[in-house]
Amino acid sequence: CSIAVGMIIEIIVMYPIQHRKYRPGIDNLLVLLIGGIPIAMPTVLSVTMAIGSHRLAQQGAITKRMTAIEEMAGMDVLCSDKTGTLTLNKLTVDKNLVEVFAKGVDADTVVLMAARASRTENQDAIDTAIVGMLADPKEARAGIREIHFLPFNPTDKRTALTYLDGEGKMHRVSKGAPEQILNLAHNKSDIERRVHTVIDKFAERGLRSLGVAYQEVPEGRKESSGGPWQFIGLLPLFDPPRHDSAETIRRALNLGVNVKMITGDQLAIGKETGRRLGMGTNMYPSSALLGQTKDESIASLPIDELIEKADGFAGVFPEHKYEIVKRLQARKHICGMTGDGVNDAPALKKADIGIAVDDATDAARSASDIVLTEPGLSVIISAVLTSRAIFQRMKNYTIYAVSITIRIVLGFMLLALIWKFDFPPFMVLIIAILNDGTIMTISKDRVKPSPLPDSWKLAEIFTTGVVLGGYLAMMTVIFFWAAYETQFFPRVFGVSTLQRTATDDFRKLASAIYLQVSTISQALIFVTRSRSWSFVERPGLLLVVALIVAQLVATLIAVYASWSFAAIEGIGWGWAGVIWLYNLVFYFPLDIIKFLIRYALSGRAWDLVLEQRIAFTRKKDFGKEQRELQWAHAQRTLHGLQVPDIKLFSEATNFNELNQLAEEAKRRAEIARQRELHTLKGHVESVVKLKGLDIETIQQSYTV
């Protein structure tokens, strides 16, 4: 748009008003067209994303859709599975806690029956844990002949084995979700209450329950329904949290990403896992998503607000995941969703960033945007940081490209209209080639990822670009005026004059303007790539080398080149030194202008710059971390991970309000203290479970 406006103004002024010749007018229009269009933008952005995608793949996150990198940089909510992502998915069973429900059956028999209902090859985590409890895995099929095995499926939620014993009698065993196994039992009404009591007891300790049932098949055919099912026992399954999950969740909160646990397990298990991981226990059953909860404390809350504030949901089915994503997106959140099953595909497709976890099904991988090759939450958070670094490079270049477009269009338009200076189009082409070749290296530049979710803030990008570009254009206009209209440079530095003459052909002046525009334009990238002073944040080596080479070439051209076809003549090393000094002096205000723009857009421009003098503070990065982590601090406070330390009241606050605030602060402090204690206790219990020790004995021996 700016290029079109500049060309229209030039056409109107040069031909009807100034009556310029046809050819010089076309040359001036070409200068705006060649120099103003950011020709390298598609290449730079594509190469940056391609290199970033390769980097993500090295970290264990394969990107299927390039634009997912931008969306992951802006992700502020991550809905994560519990099993395998937050936990190890390496189950253990405590035989001492096995509950027996049938007469004449002991815990060893329950384990054996569960092992018979398990695969001996291509095992999942549950099968591995159950069969691993036997002294010899071969015992699972010892003395029997397998007739038919029913694998697990999301509908039945159980496995079953039909087999013949040594006497030729047919039997059938099944293991799976307790509710499904309980529905098979002939005496369901008699044992239902006790079964639920045991399940709740296990859940309060973070243990999942696995039901086991047995029946005889007197007909001797695998298709027959068989005799009555006997519910013989419940096995407790412990899935320990990953050693890095708690720290990863804290990192996510500090990065402005709110992690929500989405699990199909019971609510008590979800809360216990959340307590151990320090991610909060503000979790709700899936019925709350449909407004069917019996909890009066949340019945009045809108479902959208409930989902936004919850730490997680339990008892979730795939259709619930889709609903969660849809409602979070309606609240203007950039939402990521993890999944592994066929039924997760709709939610993965709906999410802004669908993430197929390690060992996901082909359907889940197909519907996702990113496929993980490593388990755990840490690989996702690492991918978020890498995505933000990639996005920061693209954002830096975009601001640079806008600035250069404005400075070329405005600067050369003013020179052409005020002094009728016809800059050679060929030299603009040289500037574009050198600048674009240098800027290609930004795809591997060293940058600091944004500490908060980032996105394309067009107001910031265009405002910064227009102001910086306008400043650079004025630099060029002032330099031209000083060199062409005055004797300032010859008088101060002793160089030859470029002042207006009767036979002026602008050849040396064109070389001087070329060097001035080329050097300061390339130096601008150091301003746009940094959040603080440009000379504080160290750039990548490749960018520095490319800049030095390009500037050396530009300087040699300006000093020695006398090209009649380009209408330039060498200006010598004296003028080259003057131009470098001029650009260096006017370079430093660029950082100050950048700070002023940033503070103006934040809505707190003048009080920060003039009163608090943030731009001139001695704090590292000008207090950047303190300001940008305020949002993350608020999120951690909401989760009870720390006590708020901001000033909660003004001088006009009355005593009643002070008392209320004091009580609230006391309550939050107690919540934070209890959460830390629970988290520590959870770590201890996890270690005890993994070591196979007696938890009751250990609890008597340690205190928190």
UniProtKB/Swiss-Prot annotation:
GO cellular component, one term: plasma membrane
Role this protein plays: The plasma membrane ATPase of plants and fungi is a hydrogen ion pump. The proton gradient it generates drives the active transport of nutrients by H(+)-symport. The resulting external acidification and/or internal alkinization may mediate growth responses.
Quaternary structure (record): Possibly exists as a homodimer or a homotrimer.
Extracellular topological domain residue ranges: 17-26, 418-422, 483-507, 562-570
Organism: Solanum lycopersicum
GO molecular function: ATP binding; ATP hydrolysis activity; metal ion binding; P-type proton-exporting transporter activity
Remaining remarks: As many as 6 to 8 closely related genes may encode other isoforms of plasma membrane ATPase in tomato, like the LHA1 gene product which is 96% identical to the LHA2 gene product.
Catalytic reaction(s) noted: ATP + H2O + H(+)(in) = ADP + phosphate + 2 H(+)(out)
PROSITE patterns: ATPASE_E1_E2 (PS00154)
Recorded topology in the membrane: Multi-pass membrane protein
Residues involved in Mg(2+) binding: D340, D344
Domain of life: Eukaryota
E.C. numbers: 7.1.2.1
Family membership noted in the UniProt record: Belongs to the cation transport ATPase (P-type) (TC 3.A.3) family. Type IIIA subfamily.
Protein name as it appears in the record: Plasma membrane ATPase 2
Main location: membrane
Protein keywords: ATP-binding, Cell membrane, Hydrogen ion transport, Ion transport, Magnesium, Membrane, Metal-binding, Nucleotide-binding, Phosphoprotein, Translocase, Transmembrane, Transmembrane helix, Transport
